[in-house]
Regions:
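Short, charged cytosolic
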Residues: 2-28
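Hydrophobic alpha-helical transmembrane segments of multi-pass membrane proteins
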Residues: 22-27, 39-96, 173, 192, ...
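Membrane-helix interface "capping/anchor" motifs
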Residues: 150-163
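Central hydrophobic cores of alpha-helical transmembrane segments
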Residues: 161-172, 191
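Juxtamembrane or sensor-core-proximal signal-transducing alpha helices
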Residues: 190-226
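Sensory modules in modular signal-transduction proteins
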Residues: 224-246
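PAS/PAS-like sensory domain cap-loop motif
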Residues: 247, 257-264
Length: 264
């Protein structure tokens, strides 16, 4: 019975994370969106540094196995991926998340995730699909590393993360099948499973990220409400003040208190 309840709660939590939508007032939604941009700006700069060794490793494999034509095509996609990464870096440096048009910036990030996903995954997938690079553990590591890196960079923008993972996984899976035939199906299925795990993990991080900010916003609103109530109570209480003399008789009553006792 306990195991069934635990499994049921786990499935409910998973469904809640996959179908999560921010149902709060516009002010809180904007606060969360701006915090997303701040988080993305920090993570994307780290992601660019991590991308460098992956790109260098991919170039080494290209020059070791692929022909000149495929090296040229892959270098073209590498330049596109590098351009998008540099564009994103300099935009985030100049961006002020507190004043920027967060909707326009988010749309730009989503578009960048699509272009980056196509470019970054095509660097090795195209020469590998046409037999220029032999299938090895290095190919699988680079493919999985690209998925994990994309989930890390775009994790604070779920739509961008989904597009990147979907495009990258599809291109790599098709290249596995094209290069290895039926033998590549198992590798493609494993890659899809890995991508789903990455997507779920970073969605869970985003879910907790949003819940923390919503809770903090509600706590702030509750504290402000209590402050206003206490202020109102103090103002109302001051209307009923009075003083007493040495004989314990009321003197200097407030206007409201005197009016109530008809002492004026």
């Amino acid at each position: 019975m306990g195991e069934r309840i635990t499994l049921q709660r786990l499935l409910e939590m998973q469904k809640k994370i996959w179908n999560f939508k921010i149902s709060v007032d516009p002010e809180t939604a904007e606060l969360v969106a701006r915090e997303q941009l701040k988080s993305f700006g920090q993570l994307s700069r780290i992601g660019i540094l991590v991308t460098l060794p992956l790109g260098i490793y991919a170039l080494v494999m290209l020059f070791a196995f692929a022909g000149p034509d495929y090296i040229a095509v892959s270098s073209f996609f590498l330049v596109i991926a590098g351009f998008m990464g540099g564009r994103n870096y300099f935009r985030q440096v100049a961006l002020d998340p507190d004043t920027a048009d967060y909707k326009a910036v988010t749309r730009s990030i989503v578009l960048e995730s699509i272009i980056t996903g196509i470019a970054f995954s095509s660097i090795l997938s195209i020469p590998f699909a046409f037999g220029q690079i032999p299938f090895s553990l290095d190919i699988a590591i680079l493919a999985m590393g690209g998925l994990a890196l994309g989930g890390f960079v775009y994790g604070s923008i779920p739509r961008a993360q989904t597009y990147y993972l979907l495009i990258t996984t599809t291109i790599h899976a098709l290249s596995f099948i094209a290069a290895e035939g039926y033998a590549g199906i198992s590798a493609a299925v494993l890659l899809v499973f890995f991508a789903l795990c990455i997507d779920y993990i970073f969605r869970m991080f985003f879910f907790n990220f949003v819940q923390r900010h919503i809770h903090a916003s509600r706590q702030k609103d509750a504290a402000e409400t209590v402050r206003l109530l206490l202020h109102d109570y103090a103002e109302q209480s001051s209307d009923w003040l009075w003083e007493i003399n040495d004989r314990h008789l009321i003197v200097n009553p407030s206007a409201r208190f005197a009016s109530a006792l008809k002492m004026e």
